[in-house]
């Protein structure tokens, strides 16, 4: 049923689907509306050219997978539901590792409504099943990003460590906490 409606997976309130180039206008509008929510933690693409390059990497690069978390309903967008947020799996490694690094963001209109919890859980389940069949997913979060840490915790990720100067963001090397989940830990 989900595939007939364009979703890779769906829950009671949201479905997840791949990024498309056609989502650019809505995505950019949502990014602009959410600038205060995202700063200083992330900077999603906010122009048509930046979105096209970003979506292109997620669509074409086999070491990445991008998912839009969409509200189920009668709003704008390919599925009729507004885009509530996004979840990307980056640095996908196959072979003996079977791991990927997650990045995600909610849009302001959806923040605090539980939609990203549902969406992230759907992405995790999808990533551990076919076609990706990953074994481990990691999230690296700046220690001050309480909302992202709470989301990781709600979705069953465990804190594994601290990485000083892990990622260059907004002009400086930022410390990160490392959270992870394995297929064995997945909430059944």
What does each model-identified segment do?
Residues 36-56:
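Conserved GNAT-fold acetyl-CoA-binding loop/helix
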Residues 1-26, 30-34, 70-188:
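Acyl-donor (CoA/ACP) binding surface of acyl/acetyltransferases
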Residues 33-36, 60:
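Short helix-loop boundary/capping segments at the starts of domains
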Residues 43-44, 67, 168:
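Sparse recognition of residues in long alpha-helices and their boundaries
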Residues 19, 30, 43-50, 61:
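Generic, well-ordered alpha-helical segments
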Residues 56-68:
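A short helix-loop-beta-strand connector motif used in the catalytic cores of GNAT acetyltransferases and
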Residues 44-46, 56-58, 101-103, 177-178:
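Short, charged/polar low-complexity linear motifs in solvent-exposed/disordered segments
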